[in-house]
Every structure is written in C-alpha cells, then in structure tokens.
Amino acid sequence: MTEVNKPPRPGGWTSFVTARPRLSLLVALVITALAVLAGSGVADRLGSGGWEDPDAQSTYATKALEREFPDSQPNFMLLLDAGRATVDDPAVVAEAERLTARLAAEKGVTGVGSYWQADPAQAPALRAEDGHEALIAAHITGDEKAMGETLDRIAPSYRGAHGPVEVRIGGLVAVRHEMQTIIQEDLTRAELIALPVTLVLLVMVFGSAVAALLPLGIGIVAILGTNAVLRGLTEFTDVSVFAMNLTTALGLGLAIDYALFIVRRFREELSTGAEPLTAVATTLRTAGRTVLFSALTVAVSLAAMLIFPQYFLRSFAYAGIAVVLLAAAAALILLPAALVLLGHRVDSLDLRRLFRRGRTARTSGEQGSAWARAATLVMRRAPVFAVATTAVLIVLGLPFLGVKFGTADDRQLPSGAESHVVQQHIRDGFPGSPGGGLEVLAEGRATPAQYTAYKEQIAGLPGVQRVDGPLVKGRSAYFTVLPKGEAVDDTAQRLVGELRAAHAPFDTKVTGTAAVLVDSKHAIAERLPWAAAVIAVVTLLLVFLLTGSVLIPIQAVVLNALSLTAMFGAVVWVFQDGHLSGLLGFTSPGSIETTLPVLMFCVAFGLSMDYGVFLLSRIKEEYDRTGDHNTAVRHGLQRTGGLITAAAVILAVVMVAIGTSRVTNTKMLGLGIALAVLMDAMIVRSLLVPAVMKLTGRATWWAPGPLKRFHQRFGVSETDGERNPLRGAGDRATSHDGPADIDGDGSAHESGGVRAVR
C-alpha cells in the first residue's frame, strides 16, 4: 500500500472520541437529560420585546415618564363597546365608572384614567368618533415577567360582558403577552410538522432508517442543549422568545447538514473496505475538519449580531452560536461514537427497498452523471450562466430598494387576536388616542411662562397637529405632541428631530413610537458597518485558510451577498407591500421592522457559507489531487451538488414549518430564510459559483508567496494530512482518487440528487 493510500491510524482526537463509544453515548444521554431539566420552563422567562436601543434618548425618556408620570405611558387598555347605545348613556357611564375604580384598586396597576373621568381637553381622545366605544387606560408596572403575571391575574375578570358594555383587552402589555403565547404554540406545531417530514426526507436521502435517525438525534441534542444555555442566560440578561424559533431551525438544519456530510464520508470509507474504526478516523480527519470549519463560519456570522444594542438581535446571537457549536460538537463526538458501534449496520432497515418492487436502484454513476453533465454545461457556457444568474438575482432583489422601516406592533399578530383587534379599533376610531403621539420630557426647574413659551414654539412646528400639557411634577414635566398623519410615518419621524432640535430653557428628551423607531434606525445604521466588516474580514480569513487562495474568499463574500438579494426582494414584495397576504395569512403593516433585515442577513449569510464551505472544500481537495482547475470545479460540483441540494431542501422544510407561525415576523424569518437557502443551493452553488470559477481559471488559486507559506502552516482542508506526490510539497492530498460508486446494495457514494448519500 502506498503512503498516499495508507489508512490513517486512530490517534489524538479520534482516539478520544472512539475509544469508549458506549461510554461517550451514555455520558451524552446523561448530559442531555440534565439539559432537559435545566432548560425546562425557558419560554416563560423569555421576553417578547427588545427592538429598542436601551441606551437611546427615547428609552431614557420612556423609563423616566413611567416612573414620574405613569398615566403618560398607558400599556393596558380596556375597550368598552356600548353596542347600540352610546358611551354617554347613564347605564354605560355607571358601569364604566365602576370598572375604572376597580382597575385603579388592582395591585401593580397605576395611572388609571378613562373617558368618563378625564378632563375636557383629554376626553375626546378616549372616545370613539362614532360614540359607541370608549377607553379605560392604565399602566401595569414591573418588568416583562411581572407585567405578564399581572395581566394573567386581572384580565379574565375584565374580559367579556359587564352589564350594558362588552369589554376587550389591549395595550402593549396585552400585545406582547399574546405574541409570546402564540409563538410558543406555533413553535410546538412547527416542530410537529418539521420532525416527521424531515425524517421522511432523510430516509429518502439515506435509504436506511437507522442512518436517517442519526441526524435527528444530533439535532434534538443541540436544541435541548441550547434551551439550557438560554435558560442560564436569562439569569444575567434579557433574551427574546423569538430566539427559540432559530434554535429549532438551526438545531435541526445544521445537525442534518453536518450528519449528511459525515455519514456520507463514513459510508464511502466503508465501501473501500475499511474497518469501521478506521473509517471513522478518516472521516474525522477529512469531513470532520470541514464540519468544524463550517460551524465556525456560521457562528461568526451570527456573532455579528452581538454588536447591536437591541436584545432582540443579541438573543439570536446567543441562541445561534450555542446551537451551531452544540450541533457541531454532537456531530463530531456523538455521531462518530454511534458510527463505530453501528459499523456496516448504519445501512440497516433500508425502507426504500419496500417501494422499489423490482426496479433497479440508481447507482452513484447515474446520479453523479446528472451533476457532471450540469457542471460541464455550466462551465462550457460560463459567461452566459454568470451573467444570467447574476441578472436574475439582481432583478429579484429590486423591490428592496423601496423598503420602508417601521416598528413591531400588534399587526404582527393574527387578525383575530384580541389585542390586535383592540389596537386596530383604536387606530381607526380614536384620533389622538393614548400612545399614538410623541412625549417630550422636560427636566429642570422652569416657570409657567417658560413652559407656555416652549409649548407655543413646538405647536408651531409644521408637523404638529396639537400639543397637550404640560403636566408638572417637581422638577419634571411632560408635553404630549400629536403629529399630523400616521404615528410613525415620515412626517412623525421628521418631527422627532425637530422637537429634539428645538431650543428650550430646560433639558428635553423625546419619546413615543416614532422616536423609538428613529433611535432604532440610528443604532442599526451606526453599527451595521462594523458588523458587516466583522463578517467580511473573518469570512475572508477563514476561506483563505480553507483554500489558500486570495481570490476565492473575495468571490465567496460577493457571491454570498448576491445570493441574499432574492430573499430581501421577496420580503419587501410580500410582507411590506402585502402581496400574497391573504394566501399566507398575515396583516401587512406596510413596513419592515428595522431589526429583521439584519437578523435575516446574518442567518442567511452564515448558512450560505455553510454550503460554500462544503463545495469549496471538495473543489480544493480535487485541485490538490489533480492540479487541474476545470476538473476540480466539475468534480467538486459533481460530488457535492446532490448533498448540498438535499441539505438545503431539508433545511427549507424546517424553515417553512417555522414560517407557518401566525406572528408575521416569525413567518417572514422562516419563509425568507427558506427562500435564501434554496436560491443559494440551487442557483448560486450549482450555477453561479462554477461559472465564475471557470471564468477566473487558474488565477482562482493565486496567492503571494508569504500568504502561501502562511496557508501551508495554518491552512485547513478536507484531507487526511498526507502529501500527494502528484502535487508540490506545499499541497495537501486526499487519500482518495475518485468517488466511491455503489451497486445499489446500500453502500455509500458521494453524488446524486436527493439520494446523494445512498
């Protein structure tokens, strides 16, 4: 046996993983059980907010107003509907006053006011224009958990019929509490959808039920472990309930990606006659390196969200980093231990044979030939495919040029949700209602004349409809400014800047929905270049370590970004502009929440790099083996095209299951990421990457001398570490000279369509 083909002996990490496989699995089972206990009840400790910048002026003003003037920040509403009567009917007035007094006596409730007890200047804002509805407004105190507990305690006794009125519950506390409940319910349903469908697809990919169960096991371990991590983090910081959706999606999706890659390589080694232990050793030295490398690239993309101040984004970074690293750890520790124990039995329970009924199974040669023909066609017409696919992606992304950013409000909820119905009634029938305007907090001593002069000054601003106040308490006061038009339209956002620029003899700070939006946009715009730079620089470095090329990392960043254009265009066209809203079952708010594009970019870019690493590692391996650029690109696509497509389809299924959520942001995240991974796998990896690499030719692999030496010392590749006599001394070589074919008996192969691993 030559040095190149000599099987590696288990050692180091491989020995650690495989020396006692039963013990490894037992320890993993115990740790998983502990994670279940540690992560139990995590959903109840997660928040449903986090879109605002905690260091912004609007956040400071909101907290100060809640502390000094709780009635200025109503977050709990009772909508009283008098039916055919009016809200001024004596019987309605009596019942409304009784409910107002009762609510004012509730523990944890302050700042209670109502139409029936308000002063003449404020009363019209609490009465519907048609006279049949009116509001009781209040402020529930405490953090999100305390507010939720108060709401659970008092809401049931107010909801429903009370004499001549029907009462419904709304306000920010009700919206967020209902959103949290719906997300938890939808996540459970998504898991019930995704798990069986994923299992069926895995059986189609692997053929063997035993092999198909391995990725699911890895995914479940990663999800349970991440829930425990999130539960621990809630002791130190705020964590968003939305992060649980990413935990499920990436836990299943990446675990399946990594398991596909490792099991495929393991079966290939078995097909060459290697013993299970030797096959695992080679698998960890080759595919294992690529899996670890891929996990690092995905984790870096997700870690970029830690740069932003909003805990909504930071929560996805916490969950994403944890689930990616746990999925990789499980794939590199538990999966090899299971493969050592299973050996050739990994192909047991071949369920596809039940449906063949005498038909001949497709061989790897037949399956791989389809990808080989596709690769040959793409490279023969490289300029056409490069221009055409780029043009298609750019056109699909054009709607994003019309993006409008807004805030997350009750319109995230399904149309029948009680708190959404109440807020919609308020928007439609209560001009100047509480929470629809801007508040100006004034701090510092001032005379009545100074307050009056300031009020007249801001009342003269072009975007102002009305100014109420001031309400003075000690050294503080506040004014309520009602803007013309919608609460968060361009006029309201310009007014925020004008109010902040207005001269005053005291310190002023502006808050309100439009102010929160302005501050959130500023925080994201200020930190976005840093996040993009972190992702780009680290990606360039990691891809260079993988390939040793200067050009390929640049191609990877540019093509990855290009692959996301379709996702962003679709998000605006569907969720902002409202196309397909009836079919998909959501209410379009006419804008995109400011943090969503950042979140979707980081997640989708990381997943694109995941597939990019799989493809590039194989192309690099072929180039090291043959020194022929065109052959390397063609064989790389031939050997990984089916694998990447299968992984993308399965991940898309999981994301679509998440996208069945009734909460619009979650639906947008799920369906948007599903589209992104499919476009990346089927267009960018299959068409655009090989076309561009064909056009760049051998220059693709160029690097200056110092960088070549750096890569030779620190580079990573999917090889077993042996030198290839066919290449220069500085190149690494694979232990294989070509793909492993099968004869339909369940042995492994590397290429094909959905059956790529069979």
Question: Residue spans of the language-model regions?
Answer:
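Structured non-transmembrane domains adjacent to transmembrane bundles in polytopic membrane proteins
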Residues: 54-76, 83-176, 402-583, 591, ...
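Loop-to-helix "switch" segment enriched in basic
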Residues: 46-50
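Membrane-embedded transmembrane helical bundles of large multi-pass transporters/channels
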Residues: 1-45, 109, 142-405, 515-758
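A general boundary/transition motif marking the beginning of the first structured unit of a protein
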Residues: 5, 53, 87, 326, ...
